[in-house]
C-alpha cells in the first residue's frame, strides 16, 4: 500500500541520526522527511499542490472538480452528427427494428449493467486496445472495485500524470515536467547503507548497467533484478534455466556480484514474483535507468500479494461452504447464472488484474522521467517498506538532449510501440526471417538513426526493434527523403521523425568497430539489430552509424548465443566443420560467459577534430552547390576512417596499431578493436 504519511519514516530516520554521524546521511534523511511529510502524487511521487496550474504536482481538489466527465474528441464528433439525424434515421442507425429482446430481458440486462463497475474512459485509454479493455474491465463486479477503492483509497494523482497516462497527452515534455537525473543525484538522496535493488533492462543489456553504482555500494551489497525476460524467453522455465545462468554469470565475472544476488523476471507476466517478494529486503530502494520497469515490478509485487491473500481467503473452509451453498441456491432456483467454467474464471482473473494494475501502485509510462520523486510503498502483509525511485540516464549527452528526441517523435502511439519491444526468440534467432543489405545501402528505423553499409559488402539483418526498418539505395537518398517527406506521402509511415538541415547537422557520426562473425547493434531502451556478414569479404571499410544527440548505442556479441542453444561449429566428436555442414552435422550447445573476451564494445566516435569530414557533410555540401561528391573526397573519407580505427586500436591494446585494406580480421584478433 502506498503511504503519504511520514511518521514511520520519521521514527526510523531519527534512530539512524543518533546512531550515525554522517553529513551525507543527514542530507538523505532530510530529503526523505520532506518527501514523506507532504502528500505526493501516487503515480510519480511529486509533492502535490493545488495553487499553480502550471507548476509541478498540480492537482484539482475534489470539491472543485467539474461534474462533466471527459469525452473523447471522436465521441464529440460522433454525437454532433447523430444529434442532427431524424428519429427514423437514428433507429435505422442502431438497427432498433431488428432487436428481438423482450421487455423483461431488457429490464434484466439494465439491472445487470447498473451493477457493473463504472470505469472512467480516461482509465480505459491507458490500456492499449481501448474497446476491448473497456468491455472487459466493466465486467468486473462492483464488489471487487469497491474493495480496491476501500483498500487503496489514497490514489491521488497530479494533472500531468492523469493526462499522460489516461489521455496520452504529452504536450509539455520538458525537464520540468519529466525530469531526468544522473546516478550521482539519485544516490545522494538515498541514505547510506540502505539496501539497493538495481533493476536491469534485458531489452538493451548491458547498457542499463551503470558501473558507477559500485562506487556507492560493494558488489556483495547490491542486488540485481533483470526485467523484461519475456522479450528473450518464451517461457518461465527457459528464463530460469538459461536466463538465470547467463545474467548471473555476467554480473559475477564482470563485477563480482554473487550469483544469489541476481534474479531474472518478467514484470508484465509476474514470472517468479513469489520469490521476488522474499528477494527484496525491507527498506530497499529500487533504482535503475529510465524505462527499465521499476514501477512495473512494484505493481507486480503488490498484485502478487493481493492474489496470495485472495487465494488464502478462497481456501478458507467457511468461505468454501458459503460459496457452495450459494451455488446450490442458484441451481435450485433455476437461475440464468451458471457456474463459471475454467475459461470464464481465467477471464475473470484477467479482468481483475487489469483493474488492479490501473488502480494500485505507482504510475507506469513509456515516457522517460515519468517518476519524479521517491514513492514509499508499504507491503503491509510482508511487513516491508520499499521505495520507487526516479530513473536516471548514464551520460550528460542524454541528460541534455533526451527531451529533444521525444519531442520530435510524431505520435505518443509510436513511443509506446518502440518501447514495447519484440520477442527476440521469434525475431532474432538463426531461424528467424532476415533481409539482406547490399553495399552502399543505408538503413533507418523511422529516421531515428542511419546505418550505412560499405561498398562491395553484404549483410543479413534481423530486426529486434518494434518498428519496421527501411533500406535506401544510398545514404544521399535517405537524407533527401527524410528531410522532404511532404514530397513523398507514401514514405510517411516509414518515418516517425522528420528531419531538416538543422537536425541533420546535429547527427553524430560513429564507426562500428571491425568485427568477425555476427554482432548485435544495440540501441538503448529500444532493442537491437542482428548483423551478420555474408558472402566473400572484399573490403575492410567499416559500417557507419549516424545517431542524434541523446541516443546511445553499442555493439555486442549476439545475446542469443548465451540465452539459447546455438550451433557450435563442431560435430559430435568436437571436430570443426565447414560452413556448409554446420546446419546438418553441427551440435547445439549453450555458450557460457566467462569474461575471457569482451562481450560488448562502445562505438568509435568519428567527429573528433575540426578537419574531420563525413558523408553527411559532403551530401549537404553537394545539395547546396549542386555539384556531385567526387571520388577523391570519398577516398579521403575512407583513409580518415582507417586512421581513426588505428588510433582506437592503439588505445585498446596499448601498442601502436595500423588499420587498412590489407588488415586481416579473423577469429584470432577479432576483439583487438573492441573496447568496453
UniProtKB/Swiss-Prot annotation:
Q: Where in the cell is it found?
A: Mitochondrion
UniProt-listed InterPro entries: G_CP_dom, Mito_lipid_metab_GTPase, P-loop_NTPase
Q: Which organism is it from?
A: Scheffersomyces stipitis (strain ATCC 58785 / CBS 6054 / NBRC 10063 / NRRL Y-11545) (Yeast)
Tell me its family: Belongs to the TRAFAC class YlqF/YawG GTPase family. GEP3 subfamily.
Tell me the domain of life. Answer: Eukaryota
The keyword RNA-binding belongs to this UniProt entry's keyword annotation: no
> Is Secreted there in the keyword field?
no
Tell me the protein's name.
Answer: Genetic interactor of prohibitins 3, mitochondrial
Residues of the CP-type G domain = 180-395
Q: Give the encoding gene's name.
A: GEP3
GO molecular-function term, one example from the UniProt record: GTP binding
Q: What is its main location?
A: mitochondrion
Identify one Gene Ontology CC term for this UniProt entry: mitochondrion
What role is this protein assigned?
May be involved in the mitochondrial lipid metabolism.
**Chain segments carrying region Disordered:** 98-117
Q: Where is the composition biased (Basic and acidic residues)?
A: 98-110
Keywords per UniProt: Mitochondrion, Transit peptide
Define the transit peptide region by residue numbers.
1-48
Membrane-spanning regions, if any? none
Amino acid at each position: 500500500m502506498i503511504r503519504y504519511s511520514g511518521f514511520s519514516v520519521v521514527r526510523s530516520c531519527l534512530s539512524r541520526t543518533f546512531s550515525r554521524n554522517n553529513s551525507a546521511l543527514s542530507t538523505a534523511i532530510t530529503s526523505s522527511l520532506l518527501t514523506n511529510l507532504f502528500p505526493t502524487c501516487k503515480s510519480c511521487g511529486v509533492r502535490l499542490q493545488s495553487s499553480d496550474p502550471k507548476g509541478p504536482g498540480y492537482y484539482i481538489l475534489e470539491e472543485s472538480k467539474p461534474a462533466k466527465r471527459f469525452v473523447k474528441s471522436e465521441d464529440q464528433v460522433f454525437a454532433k452528427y447523430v444529434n442532427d439525424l431524424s428519429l427514423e434515421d437514428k433507429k435505422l442507425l442502431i438497427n432498433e427494428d431488428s432487436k428481438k429482446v423482450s421487455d423483461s430481458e431488457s429490464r434484466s440486462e439494465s439491472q445487470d449493467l447498473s451493477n457493473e463497475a463504472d470505469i472512467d474512459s480516461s482509465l480505459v485509454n491507458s490500456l492499449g486496445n481501448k474497446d476491448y479493455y473497456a468491455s472487459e474491465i466493466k465486467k468486473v463486479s462492483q464488489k471487487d472495485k469497491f474493495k480496491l477503492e476501500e483498500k487503496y483509497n489514497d490514489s491521488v494523482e497530479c494533472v500531468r500524470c492523469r493526462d499522460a497516462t489516461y489521455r496520452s497527452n504529452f504536450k509539455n515534455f520538458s525537464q520540468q515536467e519529466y525530469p531526468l537525473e544522473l546516478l550521482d543525484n539519485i544516490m545522494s538522496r538515498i541514505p547510506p547503507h540502505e539496501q539497493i535493488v538495481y533493476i536491469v533492462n534485458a531489452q538493451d543489456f548491458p547498457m542499463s548497467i551503470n558501473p558507477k553504482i559500485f562506487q556507492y555500494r560493494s558488489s556483495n551489497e547490491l542486488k540485481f533484478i533483470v526485467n523484461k525476460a519475456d522479450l528473450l524467453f518464451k517461457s518461465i522455465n527457459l528464463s530460469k534455466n538459461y536466463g538465470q545462468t547467463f545474467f548471473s554469470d555476467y554480473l559475477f565475472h564482470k563485477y563480482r556480484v554473487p550469483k544469489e544476488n541476481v534474479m531474472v523476471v518478467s514484470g508484465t507476466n509476474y514470472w517468479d514474483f513469489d520469490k521476488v517478494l522474499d528477494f527484496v529486503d525491507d527498506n530497499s530502494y529500487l533504482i535503475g535507468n529510465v524505462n527499465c520497469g521499476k514501477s512495473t515490478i512494484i505493481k507486480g509485487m503488490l498484485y502478487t500479494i493481493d492474489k496470495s491473500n485472495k487465494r488464502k481467503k478462497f481456501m478458507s473452509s467457511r468461505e468454501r461452504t458459503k460459496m457452495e451453498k450459494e451455488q446450490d441456491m442458484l441451481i435450485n432456483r433455476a437461475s440464468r447464472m451458471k457456474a463459471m467454467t475454467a475459461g470464464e474464471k481465467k477471464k475473470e482473473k484477467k479482468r481483475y488484474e487489469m483493474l488492479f494494475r490501473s488502480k494500485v501502485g505507482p504510475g507506469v509510462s513509456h515516457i522517460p522521467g515519468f517518476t519524479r520523486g521517491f514513492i514509499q510503498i508499504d507491503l503491509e502483509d510482508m511487513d516491508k517498506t520499499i521505495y520507487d525511485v526516479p530513473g536516471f540516464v548514464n551520460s550528460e549527452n542524454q541528460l541534455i538532449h533526451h527531451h529533444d528526441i521525444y519531442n520530435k517523435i510524431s505520435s505518443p502511439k509510436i513511443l509506446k510501440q518502440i518501447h514495447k519491444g519484440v520477442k527476440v526468440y521469434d525475431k532474432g534467432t538463426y531461424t528467424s526471417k532476415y533481409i539482406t543489405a547490399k553495399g552502399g545501402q543505408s538503413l533507418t528505423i523511422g529516421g531515428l538513426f542511419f546505418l550505412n553499409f560499405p561498398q562491395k559488402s553484404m549483410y543479413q539483418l534481423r530486426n529486434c526493434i518494434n518498428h519496421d526498418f527501411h533500406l535506401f539505395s544510398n545514404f544521399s537518398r535517405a537524407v533527401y527523403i527524410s528531410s522532404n517527406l511532404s514530397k513523398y506521402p507514401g514514405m510517411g509511415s516509414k518515418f516517425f521523425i522528420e528531419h531538416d538541415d538543422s537536425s541533420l547537422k546535429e547527427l553524430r557520426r560513429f564507426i562500428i568497430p571491425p568485427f568477425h562473425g555476427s554482432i548485435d547493434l544495440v540501441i538503448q531502451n529500444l532493442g537491437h539489430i542482428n548483423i551478420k556478414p555474408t558472402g566473400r569479404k572484399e573490403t575492410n571499410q567499416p559500417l557507419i552509424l549516424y545517431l542524434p544527440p541523446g541516443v546511445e548505442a553499442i555493439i555486442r556479441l549476439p545475446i542469443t548465443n548465451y540465452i539459447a542453444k546455438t550451433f557450435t561449429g563442431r560435430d559430435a566428436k568436437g571436430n570443426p566443420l565447414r560452413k556448409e555442414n554446420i546446419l546438418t552435422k553441427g551440435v547445439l550447445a549453450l555458450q557460457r560467459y566467462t569474461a575471457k573476451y569482451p562481450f560488448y564494445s562502445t562505438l568509435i566516435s568519428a567527429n573528433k577534430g575540426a578537419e574531420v569530414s563525413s558523408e553527411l557533410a559532403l551530401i549537404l555540401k553537394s545539395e547546396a552547390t549542386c555539384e556531385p561528391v567526387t571520388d577523391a573526397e570519398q577516398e579521403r573519407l575512407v583513409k580518415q576512417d582507417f586512421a581513426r580505427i588505428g588510433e582506437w586500436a592503439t588505445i585498446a591494446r596499448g601498442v601502436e596499431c595500423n588499420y587498412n585494406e590489407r588488415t586481416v580480421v579473423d577469429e584470432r584478433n577479432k576483439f583487438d578493436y573492441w573496447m568496453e
